[in-house]
Amino acid sequence: MFQLRNFEAIKIGLASPEKIREWSRGEVKKPETINYRTLKPERDGLFCERIFGPTKDWECHCGKYKRVRYKGVVCDRCGVEVTRSKVRRERMGHIELAAPVAHIWYVKGIPSRMGLLLDMSPRALEKVLYFVSYVVIDPGDTPLTKKQLLSEKEYREYLDKYGNKFRAGMGAEAIKELLQEIDLEKLSKELKAEIRESTGQKRVRAIRRLEVVQAFIDSGNRPEWMILDVIPVIPPDLRPMVQLDGGRFATSDLNDLYRRVINRNNRLKKLLDLGAPDIIVRNEKRMLQEAVDALIDNGRRGRPVTGPGNRPLKSLSDMLKGKQGRFRQNLLGKRVDYSGRSVIVVGPELKVYQCGLPKEMALELFKPFVMKKLVDEGLAQHIKSAKRMVEKIKPEVWDVLEEVIKEHPVLLNRAPTLHRLGIQAFEPVLVEGRAIKLHPLVCTAYNADFDGDQMAVHVPLSMEAQAEARFLMLAANNILKPQDGKPVMTPTQDMVLGCYYLTADEEGVQGEGKYFSSPEEAITAYQLGYIHIHAKIKVKMTKEIDGVKKSKIIETTVGKIIFNEAIPQDLGYVDRTNPETAFDLEINDLVDKSKLGKILDRVYRLHGPTKTAETLDKIKELGFRYSTKAAITVSVSDMVIPKEKEKLLKEADEMVSKIESQFRRGLISEEERYESIIRTWNMTTEKVTEALMTSLDKFNPIFMMAHSGARGSKNQIRQLAGMRGLMADPSGRIIELPIRSNFREGLNVLEFFISTHGARKGLADTALRTADSGYLTRRLVDVSQDVIVREEDCGTDEGIYVEEIREGNEIIERLADRIIGRVAAEDVVDNEGKIIVRRNELINEEEAEKIEKAGITKVKIRSLLTCKSRHGVCRMCYGRDLATGELVNIGEAVGIIAAQAIGEPGTQLTMRTFHTGGVAGSDITQGLPRVEELFEARKPKGLAVISEISGVVRINESKKRREVIVTDEENSISKTYLIPYGSRLKVHDGQVIQAGDELTEGSVNPHDLLKIKGIFAVQTYLLQEVQKVYRLQGVEINDKHIEVIIRQMMRKVKVEDPGDTSMLPGELIDMFKFEEENKKAVEKGLKPATGRRALLGITKAALATDSFLSAASFQETTRVLTDAAIKGKVDPLLGLKENVIIGKLIPAGTGLSRYRNISVVKKVKDQQDAQDKEKEEAEVKASN
């Protein structure tokens, strides 16, 4: 096995026939596989031991040489080398073809590479290859032209007329001859001249041809290598044949395909030897061509070759393609040792960083560690007896296991792993039973519940892996979400309910108004049953201030005292410097879910992760204890139906009948009638809900659950005890008959039927959404996987201006939220000229608030959109790592984090296109399809008309059509835009607009925006639009994640005029490479190229990456590989995927080369000490 770290890049190219023979260990001459009697491989067959190596370790075919001592001997009887049977996985063979055959990838691909090189149409090429027409190879002095096609009849006529003055041929032989004659350099010059002179279709064709010609010149591939004279045979253990129970054999499809090739090849050889008539030989050659096509890519041309049961056989191309192909199934998704899975149950007694591991599972996972320890401690003589002890499960094994697991973290993963919090590390605690115990607080991150979910356990083995698990992945260190930097470990459900109940206060309960000398006394009184937990009491608080004991009486409840014992008392909710408030409890009001989140956020910011983990455990403990003591439960009597409901419904009925009569009298249109009725019922539902919420008691269990944020919502309470309200029909249109009943009263048949529409649509929607969201995440990961923080500072002066995002008058995202954790690109100065933040400094929460208070509306920040790092991004442009709150570390895989942050909430987004009042054009795409539309840079549905010039608007309305005329007075140009029927105008007469402004409502086509307004405008537009979709669903995502993706979408430049560089017109090239090439050209005094930034959708961008391995493992595998082979592409192995594929450490985190090449140098101090010691000893000796 070669050393994995030894190579920097990997190259792909076409193999010459000599190369294929060089790889091969021998020619496969017979189609036989194994002898049915002896079950040994046939000689010269597809499994031949002489070619591929022995089937048994250290044993030749005939059995003359057995045992390791004959290692390397080649048997003189059967010719098999004595070696390991493993070589059957790596030794290749070959088949010498009797006639050349074209490689289907280069014939059929789009565009057909062979066709472009020869300047033949793919149809003509196919006719020649499959022996339908002749092609003229050398016209001699006849009126024929080179590469002209002749039918059988025409060929005969010309042959009679001119005899052998010209040469024509058919099949791959003819094409091979034509390819050999091509002079690439000359052709390249001709094409360049043609590109300069011609226009239109002709020029486009020349550019495409030049691209292929240039690829062959640069890569050193020869065109005739696209025709195969020799076919490689892959090692037999990669296309195995195994015996099934019934004595039958199961074999890989490839063996069938190879067998057909060999059979036809042998038959062709025989026919050629016999000198058979031309027509028979030709037919055999065509069949050989088809057999090789099926082997390489079955089904690409004509009907696929099928096996038993009409199943198409899997060819070499199919082995690579798709989810089950080599790339995605085996290279990117390996199964690993030292892992197990089991059902999870809740473990409320655990600490945040612990998990319960079933004993038998732990024993199996840590088996080698246990065995070594047994030997080390002398409990077993040697490893073998230790193994026996473990397998017999002797009692002393358990004690050793306890010791082994101490300080050895394990990883827990729950599928689907939507973001990096789906795998976290825990310290295992051995538990009885067979279920893994999970801490309740990490459930949110895993999205786990205990209705039968399963989780997988993995053991990190090496010291480095253990250290990374402990420091980076330990659950206690992953308290913040990488998406938005908010805590992910907030208490939920019972815990929230317990804290809510604990901190509530109630009027007129036992013990109200009593005084206590200390908090402890109050708690004792509560425990002895003298006061109620909710009673308002007075408590004397004592504190030492500057060494002097001071005290003050405050009003609170026992519950609040207990709650405050669990949290630090210096969170800044109370001003401790003010003697009036210095003694107050930190939290002296009702605590609900959002308040808990804020408290934890503060604890984290002030005290760091360790303290937060402790606080979390205390809150968990309290929450569970008091929700149990409160004994909150739900019963029908808790659903109190408001008395006003009947009256409100009656009023609504009257209103509706009024609207109906107006409609019948023709005062209002059908549309207005429908809208008014819907509005009436919506208002009524709202009123019923308000009446319900006011009538519910503050300690009503259902109200408490919803109000505390533990479970349920106002909406659900409305359906339980108010009225269900309006429902939508299958098309999404709202049905004007509302459901008047609630669930307590029960629905009647019609109401039940109406509500089934919505329920069914909801389920179908969820199923579709999960798949779509997963696919979106996959594309995002693929486009951004090589974005890694690679340097400290890229040194750019550029940045972007950010301001708050508004939708109409409503602020969607505040300025402060957008600049927290970013680096300022220039000094931020308030009105008095005082600097709030200097250039290149990180903006934190306080500074962001200051900036907003100072009335500054836009701030210039460093951004990923302007980062100048050639590979990856730099620390300054990225800013704060949201999961830690510090400046991002070098080596952080920010691309993948960004993709996960955008993809993970994808399932929560809605699928539907909202239908509002049936106006055409106002149907806007929202939710997941809208995000996809933006990231794929598609032309959106409901397109807005945008102005290409700045100027004054004039609106012309005639009966037939509406026009908007924009006039630019200064440059005296005007443009007229036809407004489609049904669109709403966004501008009015006489309004002054800028180029790129929308004239009608709807979504803008990002490509138009790029042309008119430029790069920055389109980036801002995409960013804001994606944010709008997520914000409407209440999902917070930090801008920088979306910026990473947009950066990747806009990395390429489309070359317009290549100047004197080696680039081709219309080529997509990385912008950094483009600048580099131009710099070289200018230095040599040549004309640089011109180009414009291109906007690619994420699928296109992922396929246009520099790494062919990454692109091939994403989509369109054969197309990517065909292209890469012809261009002789080199994969520099910079991203994560390509390194996973070839099995190297990924270049992120500690795998970055700058960290990997560190070696420890012994400290100088130690050397100094040693020298001093030697001196002392010498002195002592001397004195003696």
Curated annotation (Swiss-Prot):
Gene3D superfamilies tied to this protein: 1.10.132.30, 1.10.150.390, 1.10.1790.20, 1.10.40.90, 2.40.40.20, 2.40.50.100, RNA polymerase II, clamp domain, RNA polymerase Rpb1, domain 3
Entry keyword Ribosomal protein: no
Its biological purpose is as follows: DNA-dependent RNA polymerase catalyzes the transcription of DNA into RNA using the four ribonucleoside triphosphates as substrates.
What does the cofactor section's free text say about binding?
A: Binds 1 Mg(2+) ion per subunit. Binds 2 Zn(2+) ions per subunit.
Q: Which family does it belong to?
A: Belongs to the RNA polymerase beta' chain family.
Provide the reaction this enzyme catalyses.
RNA(n) + a ribonucleoside 5'-triphosphate = RNA(n+1) + diphosphate
| Name of this protein | DNA-directed RNA polymerase subunit beta'
A Gene Ontology annotation in the biological process aspect, one of them, is: DNA-templated transcription
